[in-house]
Amino acid sequence: MSQTFGNSSKYLFTSESVTEGHPDKICDQISDAVLDAIIAKDPTAHVACETAVTNGLVVVMGEITTSCYVEIPELVRGVIKDIGYIKPEYGFDDRTCGVLTSINRQSPDIALGVNKSQEAKSGQVDELDLTGAGDQGMMFGYACTETPEYMPLPISLAHRLSKRLAEVRKNGTLPYLRPDGKSQVTVEYHNGKAKRISSVVIGAQHDPDITTEKIQADIIRNVIKPIIPTNLLDENTEYYVNATGRFVVGGPVSDTGFTGRKILVDTYGGFARHGGGAFSGKDPTKVDRSACYMARYIAKNLVAAGLADRLEIQVAYVIGVAHPLSVSIETFNTARMNHEDILSIIQKHFDLRPEAIIRNLGLRRPIYRQTAAYGHLGRPELDLPWERLDKVDAIKATIESLSVSK
């Protein structure tokens, strides 16, 4: 077997994704649906919405401070219906599930620092200093040249497979499929470049009267082959479709789900580091979310400008303070400029204060539910502000000026 991820010339790396009907992803979508509904009416609302689903029950809880009202049970049932849990025989559906809510206001101790940052309390008048970070912590962003969307290949393919699994269910190509499902892709790398697909794993929930043989043949033909590039497949590529032989009972009937349980699926599939904070259900004053988006935006624009083939950025904050505590980068020996100059470019072109992030990326808008399944990053089918490459020309101009000055 090949050596694992590291500095070896040949290694395997695996990432997974899940469909929108996975229990944890149901929760993410509900939490972000609540956030979108509130922020559409009250853009400055403070929202921290958590969801749990289990057999026949949805619980929505959290801390929300807002001037508006939204009908949460109605939102919950709408999300469940959109996903496809609409038949009683699934054991969980939009009409018969119970919905409980337990919502409190944001802690006034937290609000003290978020609503008025330490900088503002000290008399600074820059309006971008007014909003303090919603929590302490470190956040990471990453980009690489492996795919057109500047994402690692394993997670990119895994997301596309999971999304395709939902598509063939919804469009009737494979009408016997049910909403729950997972995918996993193992890529073999040679000298840091993707060489071939070692294995593809699909778990697809299905009706009880379909044979394993039919499911396996249908999934390979209608899901895997249309997604995986043929030049990466060979006679040694292994396919695992419903490896236990049966996947009838799924969704919240078989597994309890929670918001924020799929943080690597949401980001880089384990290819880059993660600070530990989840995204869904959080308004953009929570740097767990907004700073991760900003870090991705920075990394993607720097890589697209040719500064490195792989770049990871870490940003750290303290609650109630606008300016980050630290900013650091790792380029994995692919940089075409020293790290000090790259950091100076980041400082020149990207403002990492929470209010600046919110304004520059336009984050006080109902744009979040669409990110709650199939990845928050590297989504070419969505017009996500943190995926835009609108800083590349300015970065290149700065690179030229630095070269001239030296």
From Swiss-Prot:
User: Which terms in the Gene Ontology molecular function aspect does this entry carry?
Assistant: ATP binding; magnesium ion binding; methionine adenosyltransferase activity
What task does this protein carry out?
Catalyzes the formation of S-adenosylmethionine (AdoMet) from methionine and ATP. The overall synthetic reaction is composed of two sequential steps, AdoMet formation and the subsequent tripolyphosphate hydrolysis which occurs prior to release of AdoMet from the enzyme.
Record's signal peptide? none
Reactions performed catalytically: L-methionine + ATP + H2O = S-adenosyl-L-methionine + phosphate + diphosphate
State where ATP binds: 22, 180-182, 246-247, 255, 261-262, 278, 282
Q: Which GO terms describe its biological process?
A: one-carbon metabolic process; S-adenosylmethionine biosynthetic process
Query: Which cofactor is recorded for it?
Result: Mg(2+); K(+)
How is this protein annotated for GO cellular component?
cytoplasm
Residue ranges of the region described as Flexible loop: 106-116
Q: Which residues bind K(+)?
A: 50
Taxonomically, what lineage is the organism? Bacteria, Bacillati, Chloroflexota, Dehalococcoidia, Dehalococcoidales
Sites where the protein binds L-methionine = 63, 106, 255, 286
Q: Which CDD domains has this protein been placed in?
A: S-AdoMet_synt (cd18079)
Q: What is the name attached to this protein's record?
A: S-adenosylmethionine synthase
Q: Check the record and name the Gene3D superfamilies matching this protein.
A: 3.30.300.10
Q: What is its main location?
A: cytoplasm
* EC identifiers of the protein: 2.5.1.6
Annotated localization = Cytoplasm
The record's cofactor note says:
Binds 2 divalent ions per subunit.
Top-level enzyme category: transferase
Identify the keywords attached in UniProt to this record, alphabetized.
ATP-binding, Cytoplasm, Magnesium, Metal-binding, Nucleotide-binding, One-carbon metabolism, Potassium, Transferase
Tell me the superkingdom of the source: Bacteria
Task: Identify its protein family.
Answer: Belongs to the AdoMet synthase family.
Report quaternary structure and partners.
Homotetramer; dimer of dimers.
Alphabetized InterPro entries for the sequence: ADOMET_SYNTHASE_CS, S-AdoMet_synt_C, S-AdoMet_synt_central, S-AdoMet_synt_N, S-AdoMet_synthetase, S-AdoMet_synthetase_sfam
The residues that the entry says bind Mg(2+) are: 24
